[in-house]
């Protein structure tokens, strides 16, 4: 995409890219096991089925009947063992149990040490998101300076727009911090 040449396009681009960083963070957080069942917990699971590897979502439907239980309704009875094996070997510390075409996956409670590890990982994810946001801010400031140099905006407008970019940045960082606080609380909940 070419660099924006007016303030409205630049503002839209900055907002879109910063919002994208927050969405990526939330997706990463959804993959962190917090001791509670979440359908996203099984997103990284890939199944060896029909001579190829495929995501679990293409083999069955994941459900959350209870806070500490996931279920996988496997569509093809012949693939139940493959799905069960894929969940067990996914490195998530889960122990699936097949019951006909339904696989039950109890979510074990996290010990204190594992909770602290997950908090650190969540902190790293949020720091990566903050870095992305700061990079977008820097790109926006650089583009503003280029727009001034090219005669698209005045020096007074630059000052005003720099403040707006900073306000968007601050708001996005606040969203990241709120998401981190929520995830840490979820992780530490026993």
Curated annotation (Swiss-Prot):
It comes from the Bacteria. The keyword Protein biosynthesis applies. The keyword Transport does not apply. One of its GO terms (molecular function) is ribosomal large subunit binding. GO terms for cellular component: cytosol. InterPro entries: Ribosome_recyc_fac (IPR002661), Ribosome_recyc_fac_dom (IPR023584), RRF_sf (IPR036191). It is found in: Cytoplasm. GO terms for biological process: cytoplasmic translational termination. Keywords: Cytoplasm, Protein biosynthesis. Its main location: cytoplasm. Responsible for the release of ribosomes from messenger RNA at the termination of protein biosynthesis. May increase the efficiency of translation by recycling ribosomes from one round of translation to another. Belongs to the RRF family. HAMAP family: RRF. This is Ribosome-recycling factor. It comes from Paramagnetospirillum magneticum (strain ATCC 700264 / AMB-1) (Magnetospirillum magneticum).
């Amino acid at each position: 995409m070419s660099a924006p040449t007016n303030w409205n396009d630049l503002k839209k681009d900055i907002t879109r890219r910063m919002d994208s960083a927050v969405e990526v963070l939330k997706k990463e957080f959804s993959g962190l096991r917090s001791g509670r069942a979440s359908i996203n917990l099984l997103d990284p699971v890939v199944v060896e089925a029909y001579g190829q590897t495929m995501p679990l979502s293409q083999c069955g439907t994941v459900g959350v009947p209870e806070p500490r239980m996931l279920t996988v309704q496997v569509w093809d009875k012949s693939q139940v063992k493959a799905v069960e094996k894929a969940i067990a070997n996914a490195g998530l510390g889960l122990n699936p149990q097949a019951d006909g075409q339904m696989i039950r996956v109890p979510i074990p409670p996290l010990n204190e040490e594992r909770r602290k590890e997950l908090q650190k990982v969540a902190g790293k994810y949020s720091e990566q998101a903050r870095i992305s946001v700061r990079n977008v801010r820097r790109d926006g400031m650089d583009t503003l300076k280029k727009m001034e140099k090219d005669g698209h905006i005045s020096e007074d407008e630059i000052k005003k727009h720099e403040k707006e970019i900073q306000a968007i940045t601050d708001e996005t960082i606040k969203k990241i911090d709120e998401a981190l606080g929520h995830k840490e609380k979820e992780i530490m909940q026993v």
